[in-house]
A protein has these predicted regions:
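Conserved hydrophobic/aromatic beta-strand scaffold that supports enzyme active sites
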Residues: 3, 13-15, 75-77, 94, ...
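Short Gly/aromatic-enriched secondary-structure transition segments
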Residues: 41-48
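Adenosine-nucleotide cofactor-binding segment
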Residues: 169-172, 184-240
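N-terminal Rossmann-fold NAD(P) dinucleotide-binding loop
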Residues: 176-177
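Glycine-rich beta-strand-centered segment in the early N-terminal region that forms part
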Residues: 19-33, 48-101, 135-137
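NAD(P)H dinucleotide-binding glycine-rich loop of Rossmann-like/cofactor-binding domains
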Residues: 60-67, 72, 97-170
Length: 240
């Protein structure tokens, strides 16, 4: 199969062996895959990422002297099953997955592992229990955004905001936009969005942000304090 491989701090397209699903694994065909900002960091600063992960007990234990196929924001199609699988989803079913797999008893981060290829390849092996079928005819390209959208939703849930608080979203890249969408869905607002990019500010407004700030012209913190009605002592005043 063909894959876009990270090799010697470059991305090269080359042939590699099609992975064979082992116990509890599913062979899938990649239909769409996003490029995460972390992929760019791994390409340019991979050694720093690995070192930081080792120091903090993280999961980035990839060997950069060997080939790595990145890609963890994907939508794929079920092709075949390995041994000891339930085979609940029929071949041809479109799926997303948690970006983690258990390969031959070893936990691997999809896209940041030497053990299994990520979504920058034509085929992947994924853990059956991690699969999420794509619902309701959702377009494949949209389904591939499941992982970054989940990051935004998780951030909003972790923040545990109440209806009296005003969120300030600094940075309106994919995850920032996902945060705005999740905030809008939960009914928390007004939402203040900040970015230097005019295009991203436009997207933030489309996603539901109520106040759009260009930090070149306006202090986001002063705007937030005024809109949220915080006094000079940092005390939250009622929002009418």
């Amino acid at each position: 199969m063909k894959a876009a491989i990270m090799r010697d701090a470059k991305i090269v397209v080359d042939e590699m062996a099609t992975p064979v699903p082992s116990e509890h694994e599913v062979l899938v065909k990649t239909l769409a895959c996003g490029i995460c900002g972390s992929d760019l960091h791994a390409l340019k600063h991979g050694h720093d990422m690995v070192q930081t992960s080792l120091e903090t007990g993280g999961s980035f234990v990839m060997d950069l002297s060997k080939d790595i196929v990145m890609g963890h924001e994907f939508c794929a199609e079920v092709l075949d099953y390995g041994p000891n699988t339930n085979r609940t989803l029929k071949p041809g079913t479109r799926v997303c997955s948690f970006p983690t797999t258990v390969h031959n008893g070893t936990l691997a981060t999809v896209g940041y592992s030497n053990l299994v290829p990520g979504g920058y390849s034509e085929n992947m092996v994924l853990t059956e229990s991690m699969l999420l079928p794509v619902p309701n005819g959702l377009p494949t390209a949209h389904a591939a955004l499941t992982e970054p959208m989940a990051v935004g939703l998780h951030a909003v849930r972790m923040a545990r905001l109440n209806k009296t608080e005003v969120p300030l979203v600094i940075g309106c890249g994919p995850v920032g936009l996902a945060v705005i969408a999740a905030l809008k869905q939960t009914g928390i607002g007004p939402i203040i969005a900040v970015d230097y990019s005019a295009k991203r500010r436009e997207l933030a407004e489309l996603m539901g942000a109520d106040e759009i700030i260009d930090p070149n012209n306006t202090s986001p913190y002063e705007s937030w304090k005024n809109i949220a009605k915080y006094d000079d002592n940092g005390k939250l005043m009622p929002v009418e």
